């Protein structure tokens, strides 16, 4: 993780700079007034990773200055959730005098939740043995006795030892309704829990009074699919990463939602299927007849690289396009194509990453008359 100057007194200033930047970037598209969704000014990040430095009997977390690459000690990390900050010193203190737990430990990853669960991954430059397992179990018990709802993972080359489970269960509040999400270690999850709730509420608001079905590309663990399902008859969602698809299925069942279907495909493959260029057995095996869907709305939340040209062309076939972007530069490139046929009716900034140059944006597009 990079150097981060978390200064609550600077929060509004850095947000205003982002608002100006995003507004200027999208002025050519006649975007409506920007809706701005703030982050907490500290303790907003649900996950954090630290390297571990050994110095004689001492052991502590370090990070690296992005510009100088110099290491510096980290005892607290204001960007991270209070849960992570509470656990950081207790974890290191519990391990530093234990040879089995500290030997060749080089990294600690934290994944926390608004629901109070936390998952810790300990990464080693050595193979882990039975002694490690016994000591790790004792460590987990000790921290749980101190009030943490904690699970533990040990990792080494080609090795993963899970003490109980390798995921947390998050609960996000969307307009007063709680949604349950399984978040698996090393899988993508929204890093800023409070802003994630605001993104879901905005997406639900944008799609009120929708008709027909929803098609969603890049659905991840079903983060948006579940909340948006209330506004549509059916949701058909695609995702390529197998762990995310498995989490999405878990989340559909956990939330007792019956009108969402997830299929494991890339956006590019789905485009080929929609255009009839290829037949995919997995569609048939899952009983999915694409022709039976009546999708007027498509939702996309692509990776930083945005959508390729063919996917953009396919997306243009829908009356309404809801697009969440973690990279406004590639959103802009995609809009050069999408704006030929659609215009922006809603425009939002979500401050997922305070005190950095990164911006998360949302646009709602509707077909031009």
From Swiss-Prot:
Active-site residues, Swiss-Prot/TrEMBL: 326, 360
Cited PROSITE patterns: SAM_MT_RNA_M5U (PS51687), TRMA_1 (PS01230), TRMA_2 (PS01231)
Binding site for S-adenosyl-L-methionine: 190, 218, 223, 239, 301
Annotated GO MF terms: rRNA binding; tRNA (uracil(54)-C5)-methyltransferase activity, S-adenosyl methionine-dependent; tRNA binding
SUPFAM superfamilies tied to this protein: S-adenosyl-L-methionine-dependent methyltransferases (SSF53335)
Keyword field contains Methyltransferase: yes
InterPro entries the UniProt entry points to: MeTrfase_TrmA_AS, MeTrfase_TrmA_CS, SAM-dependent_MTases_sf, TrmA_MeTrfase, U5_MeTrfase_fam
Keyword entries, A-Z: Methyltransferase, S-adenosyl-L-methionine, Transferase, tRNA processing
E.C. numbers: 2.1.1.-, 2.1.1.35
Coiled coil: none
GO biological process: tRNA methylation
Gene3D superfamilies: 2.40.50.1070, Vaccinia Virus protein VP39
Reactions listed under catalytic activity: uridine(54) in tRNA + S-adenosyl-L-methionine = 5-methyluridine(54) in tRNA + S-adenosyl-L-homocysteine + H(+); uridine(341) in tmRNA + S-adenosyl-L-methionine = 5-methyluridine(341) in tmRNA + S-adenosyl-L-homocysteine + H(+)
Stored HAMAP family: RNA_methyltr_TrmA
Biological role stated in the UniProt entry: Dual-specificity methyltransferase that catalyzes the formation of 5-methyluridine at position 54 (m5U54) in all tRNAs, and that of position 341 (m5U341) in tmRNA (transfer-mRNA).
PANTHER family listed in its UniProt record: TRNA/TMRNA (URACIL-C(5))-METHYLTRANSFERASE (PTHR47790), TRNA_TMRNA (URACIL-C(5))-METHYLTRANSFERASE (PTHR47790:SF2)
The name this protein goes by in its record: tRNA/tmRNA (uracil-C(5))-methyltransferase
Species of origin: Vibrio vulnificus (strain CMCP6)
Gene symbol of the encoding locus: trmA
């Amino acid at each position: 993780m990079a150097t981060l100057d978390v200064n609550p007194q600077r929060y509004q200033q850095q947000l205003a700079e982002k608002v100006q930047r995003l507004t200027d970037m999208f002025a050519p598209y006649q975007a409506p007034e920007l809706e701005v969704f703030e982050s907490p000014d500290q303790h907003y990040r649900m996950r954090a990773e630290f390297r571990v430095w050994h110095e004689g009997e001492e052991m502590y977390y370090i990070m690296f200055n992005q510009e100088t690459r110099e290491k510096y000690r980290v005892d607290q990390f204001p960007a991270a959730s209070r849960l992570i900050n509470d656990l950081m010193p207790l974890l290191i203190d519990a391990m530093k005098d234990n040879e089995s737990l500290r030997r060749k430990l080089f990294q600690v990853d934290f994944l926390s939740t608004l629901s109070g669960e936390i998952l810790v991954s300990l990464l080693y430059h050595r193979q882990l043995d039975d002694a490690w397992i016994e000591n790790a179990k004792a460590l987990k018990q000790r921290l749980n006795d101190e009030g943490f709802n904690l699970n533990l993972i040990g990792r080494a080359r080609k090795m993963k030892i899970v003490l109980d489970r390798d995921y947390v269960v998050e609960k996000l509040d969307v307009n007063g309704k709680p949604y349950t999400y399984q978040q698996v270690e090393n899988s993508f999850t929204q890093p800023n829990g409070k802003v994630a709730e605001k993104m879901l509420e905005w997406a639900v608001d944008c799609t009120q009074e929708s008709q027909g079905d929803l098609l969603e590309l890049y659905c991840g663990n079903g983060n948006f699919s579940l909340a948006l399902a209330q506004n549509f008859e059916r949701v058909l969602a695609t995702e390529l990463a197998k762990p995310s698809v498995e989490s999405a299925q878990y989340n559909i069942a956990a939330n007792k939602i019956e009108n969402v279907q997830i299929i494991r495909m890339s956006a590019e493959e789905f485009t080929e299927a929609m255009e009839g260029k290829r037949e995919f057995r997995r569609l048939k095996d899952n009983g999915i007849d694409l022709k039976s869907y009546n999708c007027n709305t498509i939702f996309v939340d692509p990776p930083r690289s945005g959508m390729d040209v063919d996917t953009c062309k396919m997306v243009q076939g829908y009356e309404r396009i809801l697009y969440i972007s973690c990279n406004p530069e590639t959103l802009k490139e995609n809009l050069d194509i999408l704006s030929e046929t659609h215009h922006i009716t809603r425009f939002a900034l979500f401050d997922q990453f305070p005190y950095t140059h990164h911006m998360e944006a949302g646009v709602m597009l509707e077909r031009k008359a």
